[in-house]
Structures are given as C-alpha cells and as structure tokens.
Amino acid sequence: MKTLVLVAVLGLASLYLLSYASEVQQLSRDEEEFRALVASFGGLFDTEERGVDKEGCRKLFGGCVGDGDCCLHLGCKTRKLPPFADPYCAWDWTFGRK
C-alpha cells in the first residue's frame, strides 16, 4: 500500500514537471512572437526617430539662441520682463512627427 502511494505521488510530481516545462516553452514562443511584432513596427519605438535624443539639442527649459537649438516639439521662447529675458526651450504646441 505504501509503495502504491509513493508511485502515485512520484507520478503526479513527474506530470507536474512535464506540464511546467511545456508552459515555459510556450512562454518563450510567445516572447519570440512579441519581439517579432515589435520589430515589425519599423522602429516606431526608437527614440532617435522622434528627436528625443537628437545630438546637441536642448531639452525643456534649456537655454537656446534659436528654434534649431531645441529638441523636437520645442521652440526657443523668452519672457518679456528683463529679469527673465534669457531664452529657453518650451513646448511649441505641436504633436506627432514633424
């Protein structure tokens, strides 16, 4: 009787391990499909394409001389009051790609 219970427990343990291995293999297939899907967007998620990390551009509230100094969707702005006359990069009210 004890042997039969031991064999049953070992059988259940082996079935658990087999099903777990199958699930892990399925997850790796899903991960490969997800990576292929992201790659099919053609670099939509690349930050360089959107101008975020353009070399030499000024980020929000950074100093600037002209609009060309600021990153994408930012323009060189200035305040009218003399203490705040230093130009800075601010949002130019545009969306999407330019």
From Swiss-Prot:
Keywords: Disulfide bond, Ion channel impairing toxin, Knottin, Secreted, Signal, Toxin. One of its GO terms (molecular function) is toxin activity. It comes from the Eukaryota. This is U11-barytoxin-Tl1b. InterPro entries: Huwentoxin-1. Residues 22-50 form a propeptide. The presence of a 'disulfide through disulfide knot' structurally defines this protein as a knottin. The keyword Acetylation does not apply. Pfam families: Toxin_12. Expressed by the venom gland. Ion channel inhibitor. Residues 1-21 form the signal peptide. Belongs to the neurotoxin 10 (Hwtx-1) family. 25 (ICK4) subfamily. It is found in: Secreted. Disulfide bonds join C57-C71, C64-C76, C70-C89. It comes from Trittame loki (Brush-footed trapdoor spider). One of its GO terms (cellular component) is extracellular region.
